[in-house]
Amino acid sequence: MLTSELGCCYISNTVSSLNLLAEKECSQVRSTVYELKELWLKRNPDIPFYTLGAASYLDAAIEPQDYYSKALLYNPILCDRLGWLYERLADRLAQLLKARTSYHQNYALPGFHVYLACKLFEQPIASIHCDSQYKLINWESGDRTDFNNPISFTLAISLPKFGGGLNTWNLHHQEIANISRSEFVQLVKSRTKTYYPYQIGELILHSGHTVHQIAPAKNIQPDDERITLQGHALFSQGSWQIYW
């Protein structure tokens, strides 16, 4: 853990983890996600990839107001059905980061990625990127918000039979800020890639400014699925504001 100019602890460029849910609790969350299946949004016409909840990197990128409208729709439902999960997440992050945590009423609660069985997921089709979706959101007190030390996290709820995980590269967003796509591809090839396997109920945290990718799956089975809780946090106005 390191300390920023605003005096808060933050996640360094390495990947951290903490046990958040028991396997039985993950099964409970999975059941709730399926009970809300009518609210899933299909995010790609060609593959079975869905979200449950408003996702800033998708919704605010198209039309910012659409993101806030979706958050207004989904937040009460997710809070009602999974309030205990959000309370535990905030409490454990507060312990880890040694600071207050909060959920802003205008921002989306952490939501879910849902990937159903598809052989295409064995290929490296997920983007290699840094998380900069916070730029799409209106932070009410920009001068009291630490944009240099964001946090991204994933909580595995259900995984394919042969597992799932995260690829990261020893590459920071400052190194890729002003380069072309072809230069970025070559730079990624020149850096070390590290694979972090997910475990059911384990929260994986990293700086969103570290270059990363959803790792390709292995030997997808017909009944496989990959369900994860996704979210981010920025230190703003004296607390870590958790959102998606």
What are the residue ranges of the model-derived segments?
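Signature of the catalytic double-stranded beta-helix
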Residues: A61-E122, N138-T145
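Catalytic core of Fe(II)/2-oxoglutarate
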Residues: A177-W244
